[in-house]
């Protein structure tokens, strides 16, 4: 059933085609703005709060106050239509909300079409037909432009002579100035000073023919994420995990850790090696060069050897707390680690389909290995994020809340950041921003990761602190640049307008 046509002030609003029109002029608005205008018309003369607008226009979507404010501003601009004499359509009532200030008339669809068809285009004011012929003649004569006087024409010519003279003089001065500049000045883009404490993690070759490609790629992504998070949390190095970032651009990082999968003949057979190379960009020297043959059970041993080799190459001893953390977050079997990293890779993507798949894989891991409690916690995190985007039914939500209550009390998960990530998202979904803020800051104290800073940005945005939110989002993208992190910023928990909240990041990505 089509929505009825309504006249709001001078504008005829046709919701079925998302158009407003007046005096023969038609404007097409976004569906959300049309819904907002129709809701104002349905409550003409009433003061509507932001919460009422969110509940009735945005319905089940989670939006912030600035989204409502921005939509009201766009609607006001469209209704004004560059008309300085336009009446005030929507007034702001301080500390109350907004109010429609113009009269409203409702029509049926047929009446609205007749009104639109019968509305003539604006025409200039006509001369009355009862005037005398002599009067008409006078009107016609006055409409004829008078001849330009010679004095005015002469002044006009003098003006253009001086204008072109000064323009030519300015061009000559500019050419002389440009010719005197030293054109051999260095380009600023090429002057990048390396930071020896920064490390980039890149992936060169992503697959081998002799090993299942999805497992191979997700294993490398998981190892890279673990190395980046460990160094960022337990050392003074700043690591940028660029495995998901495919832009070839200059970097200021003093070191580069490259992961590649290569086929090489060994003992008359082709084998797939995972090559790990750490290069010091200051002098081009190789600090670490290792190759691993991955089998179905040595994934955990390879990862432990890599961490130990990095510790020696970087002269960075691993603290005891890191050793304890790794014991809690990693399984004790290599084959299980590959399955866990595949589920974790889906979590990194962040979209609905990937989160659903991550929940399924983690559920299988928990069922087959109930002693791996960290997988249970990560499944709870995935499920609460899914609930924030597509609310679960009452039975599913009750089961999830019970599972979360059980997980946060497990002693083997004490002092792990994932517990506070779960608490932060759960509180944020319920609108408890202060509780969420406290939880995610505790999580950041325990672990410096891109996901923690994405969640911190979401909390700041809900608190109306967009400047702090922009800093948090930029930190997250700096730690793990790429499409995955950008998707989390734009769509995780609730939708974020990157051009509005993080304009620098929007311009940076547009320059690619």
From Swiss-Prot:
Q: Which SMART domains match?
A: Trans_reg_C (SM00862)
Where, in residue ranges, is this chain on the Cytoplasmic side? 1-154
Per the record, what is the consequence of mutating residue 453 to A/I?
A: Decreases inhibition by cadaverine
Result, substituting residue 477 to A: Does not alter pH sensing
Expression triggers: Translation requires the translation elongation factor P (EF-P). This requirement is reduced as the number of consecutive Pro residues in the protein is decreased.
> Could you say what the effect of mutating residue 265 to A is?
Displays lysine-independent, but pH-dependent induction of cadBA
Outcome following mutation: residue 468 to A/Q/R: Abolishes response to the external low pH signal
Name of the protein: Transcriptional activator CadC
Provenance organism: Escherichia coli (strain K12)
